[in-house]
Every structure is written in structure tokens, then in C-alpha cells.
Regions:
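A short, charged helix-loop
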Residues: 212-236
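Helix-loop "lid/cap" segments that line or gate small-molecule binding pockets
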Residues: 92-101
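A short, Trp-centered hydrophobic/proline-enriched beta-strand micro-motif
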Residues: 116-124, 168
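A short core secondary-structure module
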Residues: 145-146, 150-195
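Flexible, small-/acidic-enriched active-site or ligand-binding loops
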Residues: 135, 188-219
Length: 388
């Protein structure tokens, strides 16, 4: 089904089996503020590496598995079946880095990250710059062979677990003043500090602190690419991660439909199984239909990446996939919680966890409203035929 070949089915099987290993740990995480014991989390990390499910977007030239975009979607889809962020051990470093990393970056950060020895985080978003990054206030001042970085970043996901951060800032001097540039910063560099760590709704094991960079000095070898390239890396990351968001939403919706259907078949109300009630049937039928449509869209978008379709067309298609799949998963979670009734409001219930965790998929990596603007912009410029 879906035209998957033997290699696709094998990577999908491995990912599904691994997700099935993670799912029993959800209750443990839920009972401990979202976190697993360190030794168990480490075993999951090592298992992902062992199975070839780590850094799946990395080419073989840097030690990655060299999977196709479709195969990467298949892996992340299975990870999406797991709550509490436990499948974040299926980490993917930035897809654009191997092409632009200088020798220093390659040896110090890139290769160890692909091997699973280091972890990155992203210091991009600010209080006044979320989906629209053109309003960044963070600055980068060239000072001899160094850059001095200043800025306060919000939602720096997994900062507490990270070894280094990608820091986006506006250049203040030189021929490219006003451009945005991207830098690699070790999290223990003097001047980097956590301002506060707010409590969030989802994936409690991964904190999302506000982090200040105050007079942080880094050598020019920490500049990613050139002073002209900063926004291009962000756009490339958005294309990739929006598709992966869509993939994870497929997995979440599939598990919700499966577990809710099983519950409705067993639950007897008024002398017959709940699944015989037409209103429940309608909710499950709508959910399954929307999942089927979202999966077809997401897989086809991945195939268009593998086929080398124009990047701006891909930008719109990835936005369409994220928009449709994330909103689909939110509707499915809402319906499934309703079918479970009071049980669906208990933390031990899968519908409660997904209802809470899936909400962010319509916000991060560009809110749904931004996706609609991107799609509409490309429609106006290219017409519908090139996009669909």
C-alpha cells in the first residue's frame, strides 16, 4: 500500500517495533513529570542508534544512514505514535549542515552529533519574533576574528540536554549589516545563561527555557556558511521539519483511531457496544478518512523531495502537509477524547496525552496561519497546477 518498496517497508518495520518498545514507558514518564530514569533514556538513545533510526536525514558521507525523504517520514510517523516526547530519541540534526559545515564545525560538532555523542538545540525564536523571524532583536557584532552575540531567545527546546545551540542574529556591521546570520555556540560559553524555565503543556521531559546570550564571544569559525546565508538555513529547516511534523501527526492519529476503536468495541452502553452508536461511528469514520488523506499528502510530498522538485514548490507542499496533518490530528484527538468520555480526561489515557501534546503542532515550525499565507503566496505566483 502507498507504493512502498522493500527497503521502505523494512525501515518502517524497524521504526514501528521500536515505537512499540517505547509505548509501555509512557506511564512511567507521566508519573515522573514527563521524565524517564536516566539509564532508561540512555538505553532508548542507544537502541535508536543500533537500529539505524538516529540522524536519519544525514548522508552517508558524514556517517548517517542516507535515507530517502520518504523513509525519514516513515520513521518519524512511527515516532509520532508515542506520547511524552519519548520518541525524541529519534533525533535529526539540521539537514543543511553537511553541505556548509567548515572543517572545524564538522569535526567538533557535526560528526559527533551524527554519532549520537552530542545534542543540539535551536536559539532562534524571541519574545517578539516567532513565526515571523524578520523582527529578530538579537545581534552579532564582528570584532576582529570574533563575533560578539547578544540576545534573549525563547522556547529553546531541550536546552538543558544540549551541548551546543544554533543562534540566529542580525549582523550590525560590515557589508551585510542588517542580514541575519547563524552561529554555533557551546551552551557552556561564558555569557550564556537560563533566564527562566516556564512550565509547558507538552513533552514535560524536554524543557523550553528562555535563554540569554550576553556578550557571548565566538570565533569566526562558528559562523555557519557565510554572512549572507542565515535565513536560507532557517527556510531549509522549516521545509524539513514541517514535513516531519506532518509525519508525526500521522502516527499520533493512527494510534488514537486504533485505541479508540478498540475501546468503543468493548464498551457497552445501553446494551450494545459503543461502536454501534451512529454518532460514534461518524466520529471514527471521519477520523480514519482524514488520516488516509493526510498520509497520502505527506507521502507524496516526501516523494517530490526525493524527485528534486523546485524548492519553492516544496516549501508550499510542506506547508500544505503540515497544515492539513496537524489540524487533522487535533480534530482526531478531540473526537477520540469525546468517545472515551471521562476516561479520556485521565492522564493515563492516550487520548488525554495526545489532546494535550498535539496542540503545539499547529503553532511551532510556523503557525497554521503562516502556512496558509505561504500556500496562498505560492498559489498567486505559480498557479495551482504546479503545486498540486
Amino acid at each position: 500500500m502507498y507504493g512502498l518498496d522493500t527497503a521502505d517497508l523494512e525501515i518502517q518495520r524497524r521504526a514501528r517495533d521500536f515505537a512499540d518498545e517505547l509505548i509501555p514507558c509512557e506511564t512511567t514518564a507521566e508519573e515522573h513529570d514527563g521524565r524517564l530514569p536516566d539509564d532508561l533514556a540512555q538505553r532508548h538513545h542507544e537502541r535508536a542508534l543500533e537500529l539505524g533510526l538516529y540522524a536519519t536525514n544525514m548522508p552517508t558521507s558524514v556517517g548517517g544512514p542516507g535515507l530517502t525523504a520518504l523513509q525519514q517520514v516513515l520513521v518519524q510517523e512511527q515516532g509520532g505514535r508515542v506520547t511524552n516526547g519519548l520518541a525524541w530519541c529519534l533525533a535529526t540534526p539540521p539537514s543543511w549542515w553537511p553541505e556548509v559545515a567548515n572543517d572545524h564545525q564538522r569535526e567538533r560538532w557535526l560528526l559527533p552529533t551524527v554519532r549520537g555523542e552530542l545534542q543540539e538545540c535551536y536559539a532562534i525564536t524571541e519574545e517578539g519574533a516567532g513565526s515571523d523571524l524578520t523582527d529578530l532583536a538579537a545581534t552579532a557584532l564582528r570584532d576582529g576574528d570574533d563575533y560578539v552575540l547578544n540576545g534573549v531567545k525563547w522556547h529553546v527546546t531541550s536546552f538543558h540536554e544540549a551541548d551546543f545551540a544554533f543562534f540566529q542574529a542580525v549582523l550590525t556591521t560590515g557589508p551585510y549589516a542588517g542580514n541575519q546570520a547563524l552561529f554555533v555556540v557551546d551552551v557552556d560559553t561564558p555569557g550564556v545563561r537560563v533566564v527562566r524555565t516556564p512550565a509547558y503543556t507538552h513533552t514535560l521531559g524536554h524543557r523550553h527555557p528562555v535563554v540569554a546570550f550576553e556578550g557571548v564571544r565566538v570565533p569566526s569559525t562558528h559562523l555557519v556558511g557565510t554572512e549572507e546565508d542565515g535565513m536560507s538555513f532557517v527556510f531549509e529547516w522549516f521545509r524539513f521539519e514541517r514535513l516531519m511534523v506532518a509525519a508525526r501527526c500521522l502516527g499520533a492519529a493512527e494510534r488514537l483511531v486504533a485505541e479508540t476503536t478498540a475501546y468503543a468495541a468493548d464498551r457497552v452502553v445501553g446494551g450494545e457496544p459503543l461502536i454501534r452508536k451512529q454518532l460514534v461511528q461518524a466520529m471514527l469514520a471521519d477520523s480514519l478518512t482524514e488520516l488516509y488523506a493526510a498520509r497520502a499528502m505527506t507521502y507524496e510530498t516526501a516523494r517530490s523531495i526525493d524527485a528534486g522538485v523546485d524548492r519553492k514548490v516544496l516549501h508550499a507542499r510542506c506547508s500544505m502537509a503540515k497544515l492539513f496533518a496537524s489540524e487533522m490530528a487535533g480534530r482526531v484527538a478531540d473526537r477520540c477524547l469525546q468517545v472515551f468520555g471521562g476516561r479520556g480526561y485521565m492522564r493515563e489515557n492516550v487520548a488525554e496525552r495526545f489532546f494535550r501534546e498535539l496542540r503545539v503542532e499547529r503553532i511551532w515550525e510556523g503557525a497554521s496561519e503562516v502556512q496558509r499565507l505561504i500556500i496562498a503566496d505560492q498559489l498567486a505566483k505559480r498557479g495551482h497546477a504546479e503545486l498540486v
